[in-house]
């Protein structure tokens, strides 16, 4: 499955469209395959510079790929915050800046979940 997913993502990035939507592209992959594919996709993206709308529930994926992260609210739905991602490329997931930004986004998400739980409760 990982090889097919890798080939499909590579084909999508090399297509001639100006905008590419990637909706949870790594969700069915194991961690090792995700890491390999993530690095390959980043290389291809850096060469093509396509606009990619990357939908994910993974904060790590969002920080790794994004130029900005759009945090969505649960109820009522909508954009809660747009966070610019200004980390240099290639990105290192173990760098201090990456870890701090991931923690900041997780904190914002937690606040949103707590707010919704309080309203429901």
Stretch-by-stretch model annotation:
Residues 9:
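Hydrophobic anchor residue at the start of the ABC signature
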Residues 1-6, 46:
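ABC ATPase nucleotide-binding domain "signature motif"
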Residues 64-71:
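Conserved catalytic segment of ABC-fold P-loop ATPases
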Residues 20-23:
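Catalytic Walker B motif of ABC-type/P-loop ATPase nucleotide-binding domains
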Residues 34-49:
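Helical segment within the ABC ATPase nucleotide-binding domain
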Residues 15:
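Conserved signature/switch motifs of ABC ATPase nucleotide-binding domains
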Residues 74-104:
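Conserved beta-strand-loop-alpha-helix hinge in the C-terminal portion
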Residues 49-55:
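Conserved H-loop
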């Amino acid at each position: 499955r990982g090889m097919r997913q890798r080939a499909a993502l590579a084909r999508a990035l090399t297509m001639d469209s100006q905008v590419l939507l990637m909706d949870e592209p790594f969700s069915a992959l194991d961690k090792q395959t995700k890491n390999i594919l993530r690095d390959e996709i980043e290389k291809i993206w850096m060469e093509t510079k396509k606009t990619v709308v990357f939908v994910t529930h993974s904060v790590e994926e969002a920080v790794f790929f994004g130029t900005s992260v759009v945090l969505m609210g649960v109820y009522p739905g909508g954009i809660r915050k747009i966070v610019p991602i200004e980390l240099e490329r290639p990105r290192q997931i173990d760098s201090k800046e990456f870890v701090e930004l991931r923690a900041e986004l997780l904190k914002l998400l937690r606040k949103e979940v707590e707010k919704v739980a309080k309203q429901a409760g």
